[in-house]
């Protein structure tokens, strides 16, 4: 029965493999797995059940139980020979952030509450954010990807110039960068890793939402490696709790009016955010905490208490507010989901 023991060992790592049975699949003469007792008018079936390691879940057409048939094939009553898969769990941090806690002046993430947060460094050493959305893909902003590159640069030009870390400074290699086809309006790009990351309590994707969580007053959390009070990049991941703002007030703050012919693009920080139907704003907390340079690419994470799941309601695009301007600007995740899923499926 050594072959079955090998299956269990491999499954503990969240991987599923065909069973190598040797010359005699029916030979149970093994001290570690004695032959089961016989019963009158009955027989013994040889069964295996596939399970996944912690932070993975089984995706199967059947129940994950396979029986050895007369042809020495492991078969499931629904899926036949097709094996199930272990897929990464998303949005289920082992140590979620305390809802009562309150990056310019944010709190330190000491317990890994934001395992989807990645740190990206440009070829000239500038730190930005990225968000893990599967065990092989991340979202970030197009502006982050274009840092120190011309506007005509392609994803192939950009990918080799980036350094990317997940978890506690785990270096990962980038296979490709894919920019949104309308990235001047939808400030987003995708990063594909060369290898899938092992999902742990420190490295876990956040879920993309199927419904819109964005509503004025709704609170989300944003983590990041951006600049702090003294305008230096932090070496500790920080987070802040921010409310979704009234969109019209945000537009007036940056553009002086919601009426197109009356707009005056005079941002209080000297840089204009991209504001359109694909974006939403989040305001300062009462403690005047805010995001800042280097936090872009991070998720506006919202906890769905009914599902006990964390979703990326948006991706931070405009991180220049730094407690000077009143609002950070985010790309709506619901507007990205179709493009993200199609792009991942094709690549």
Swiss-Prot record:
Positions annotated as glycosylated: 148, 182, 264
Alphabetical list of PROSITE patterns matching this protein: SUSHI, TRYPSIN_DOM
Disulfide bonds: 52-86, 90-207, 250-281, 292-322
Molecular function in Gene Ontology: antioxidant activity; hemoglobin binding
Gene Ontology biological process terms, A to Z: acute-phase response; defense response to bacterium; immune system process
UniProt cross-references to Gene3D superfamilies, sorted A to Z: Complement Module, domain 1, Trypsin-like serine proteases
UniProt entry keywords in alphabetical sequence: Acute phase, Antibiotic, Antimicrobial, Antioxidant, Disulfide bond, Glycoprotein, Hemoglobin-binding, Immunity, Secreted, Serine protease homolog, Signal, Sushi
Positions of the Sushi domain: 31-88
Xref: Pfam families: Trypsin
N-terminal signal peptide: 1-18
Location relative to the cell: Secreted
Annotated tissue distribution: Expressed by the liver and secreted in plasma.
Predominant localisation class: secreted
Domain Peptidase S1 positions: 103-345
UniProt entry tagged with the keyword Repeat: no
A GO cellular component annotation in the UniProt record: blood microparticle
Region feature (Interaction with CD163): 259-264
Task performed by this protein: As a result of hemolysis, hemoglobin is found to accumulate in the kidney and is secreted in the urine. Haptoglobin captures, and combines with free plasma hemoglobin to allow hepatic recycling of heme iron and to prevent kidney damage. Haptoglobin also acts as an antioxidant, has antibacterial activity and plays a role in modulating many aspects of the acute phase response. Hemoglobin/haptoglobin complexes are rapidly cleared by the macrophage CD163 scavenger receptor expressed on the surface of liver Kupfer cells through an endocytic lysosomal degradation pathway.
Subunit comment: Tetramer of two alpha and two beta chains; disulfide-linked. The hemoglobin/haptoglobin complex is composed of a haptoglobin dimer bound to two hemoglobin alpha-beta dimers. Interacts with CD163. Interacts with ERGIC3.
Domain remark from Swiss-Prot or TrEMBL: The beta chain mediates most of the interactions with both subunits of hemoglobin, while the alpha chain forms the homodimeric interface.
Entry similarity comment: Belongs to the peptidase S1 family.
Protein name per its UniProtKB record: Haptoglobin
Organism lineage string: Eukaryota, Metazoa, Chordata, Craniata, Vertebrata
Gene name, Swiss-Prot/TrEMBL: Hp
């Amino acid at each position: 029965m050594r072959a079955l023991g090998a299956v269990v060992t491999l499954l503990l790592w969240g991987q599923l493999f065909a069973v190598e049975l040797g010359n005699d699949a029916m030979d149970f003469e093994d001290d570690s797995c004695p032959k089961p007792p016989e019963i009158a008018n009955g027989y013994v079936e040889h069964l295996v059940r596939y399970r996944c390691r912690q932070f993975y879940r089984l995706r199967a057409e059947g129940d994950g139980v396979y029986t050895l048939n007369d042809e020495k094939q492991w078969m499931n009553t629904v899926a036949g020979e097709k094996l199930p898969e272990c897929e990464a769990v998303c949005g289920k941090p082992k140590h979620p952030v305390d809802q009562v806690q309150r990056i310019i002046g944010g709190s330190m993430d000491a317990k890994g509450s934001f395992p989807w947060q990645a740190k990206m460094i440009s070829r000239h050493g500038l730190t930005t954010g990225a968000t893990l959305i599967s065990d092989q893909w991340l979202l970030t902003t197009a502006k982050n990807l274009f840092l120190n590159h011309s506007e005509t640069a392609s994803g192939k030009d950009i990918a080799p110039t980036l350094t990317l870390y997940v978890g506690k400074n785990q270096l990962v290699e980038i296979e490709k960068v894919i920019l949104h086809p309308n990235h001047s309006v939808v400030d987003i790009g995708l990063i594909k890793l060369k290898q899938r990351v092992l999902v742990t309590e420190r490295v876990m994707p956040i879920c993309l939402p199927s419904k819109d969580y964005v509503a004025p007053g709704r609170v989300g959390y944003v983590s990041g490696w951006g600049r702090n009070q003294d305008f230096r990049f932090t070496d500790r991941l920080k987070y802040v709790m921010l409310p979704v703002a009234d969109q019209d007030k945000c537009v007036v703050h940056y553009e002086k009016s919601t009426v197109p012919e009356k707009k005056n693009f005079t941002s209080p920080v000297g840089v204009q955010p991209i504001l359109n139907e694909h974006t939403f704003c989040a305001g300062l907390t009462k403690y005047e905490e805010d995001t800042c340079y280097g936090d872009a690419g991070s998720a506006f994470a919202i906890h769905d208490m009914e599902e006990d799941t964390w979703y990326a309601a948006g991706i931070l695009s405009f991180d220049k507010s730094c407690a000077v301007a009143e609002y950070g600007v985010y790309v709506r995740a619901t507007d990205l989901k179709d493009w993200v899923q199609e792009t991942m499926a094709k690549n």
